[in-house]
């Protein structure tokens, strides 16, 4: 991937969109994971360039930990927020999430309750992001990549909801490529705070942080995102998966892709052509 070209395209597109629509801030949920770190870096450059031409713009990052948030990931979110964002805030939503969750229903399995609470946390974060967007005259920027979009790794009305996303059609393995490119830039710039933040983000295994399951790759059973992306590309292109890939991993990826197809086709509506008016 030509990281320089991809980065420049993303920055220029965002600059044009935000300026032409008179939007003066980007609101970003900063988790400490690779996706939000990469999006933060993209918008740091957008902010820098827009402000240099006299257009007031800022990237506002917010970390919203709960009791299930990985301590390392939260620590990294602080590194990213303080070194890359123009403004950074922390809001613990633990008690808020617990206060609005319906008590365990009789006969309901424990894993169902974990999913419910996890979804509440994700949707609460989105409520706060959109509230901040209103307060600061901005919009919410997303962190969804193509791999996780196809596999359904998002909560409907939660992290799957946003107004603008520069990495939606980047494979997860490409997000890592871009992060390493950013790392090289900051090493050359001797901005060691950003080097530290980006390198730490690259090193932490992706996970939702909702208290539902282990890391994403462990859940899939895949060794790395190159494997996952290659399988998904084969599915989309209707071509054979490389023979050296484990059959269980292939089945796991394809099963997640098929089972989450409904998320990629929402909302379901009835067209006017179906009615006899």
Where are these regions (language model features)?
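Conserved G/P- and acidic residue-centered "switch" motifs that form tight phosphate/ATP-binding loops
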Residues: 33
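ATP/NTP-dependent adenylation/nucleotidyl-transfer catalytic domains that generate, transfer
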Residues: 1-28, 38, 42-45, 49-120, ...
């Amino acid at each position: 991937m030509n990281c320089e070209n991809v980065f420049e395209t993303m920055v220029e597109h965002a600059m044009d969109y935000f300026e032409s629509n008179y939007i003066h801030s980007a609101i970003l949920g900063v988790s400490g994971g690779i996706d939000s770190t990469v999006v933060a870096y993209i918008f740091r450059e957008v902010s820098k360039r827009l402000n240099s031409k006299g257009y007031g713009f800022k990237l506002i990052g917010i970390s919203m930990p709960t009791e299930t948030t990985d301590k390392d990931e939260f620590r990294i979110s602080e590194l990213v927020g303080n070194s890359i964002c123009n403004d950074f805030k922390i809001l613990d939503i633990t008690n808020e999430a617990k206060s609005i969750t319906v008590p365990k229903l009789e006969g309901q399995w424990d894993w169902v309750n974990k999913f419910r609470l996890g979804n509440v946390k994700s949707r609460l974060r989105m409520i706060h992001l959109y509230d901040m967007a209103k307060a600061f005259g901005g919009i919410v920027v997303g962190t969804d990549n193509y791999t996780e979009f196809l596999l359904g790794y998002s909560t409907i009305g939660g992290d799957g909801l946003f107004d603008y996303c520069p990495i939606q059609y980047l494979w997860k393995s490409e997000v890592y490529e871009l992060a390493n490119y950013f790392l090289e830039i900051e090493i050359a710039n001797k901005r060691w705070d950003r080097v530290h933040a980006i390198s730490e983000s690259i090193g932490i295994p992706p996970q939702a942080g909702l208290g539902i399951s282990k890391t994403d790759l462990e859940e899939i059973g895949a060794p790395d995102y190159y494997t996952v992306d290659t399988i998904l590309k084969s599915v989309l292109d209707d071509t054979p998966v490389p023979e050296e890939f484990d059959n269980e991993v292939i089945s796991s990826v394809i099963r997640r892709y098929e089972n989450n197809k409904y998320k990629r086709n929402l909302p379901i509506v009835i067209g006017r052509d179906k009615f006899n008016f």
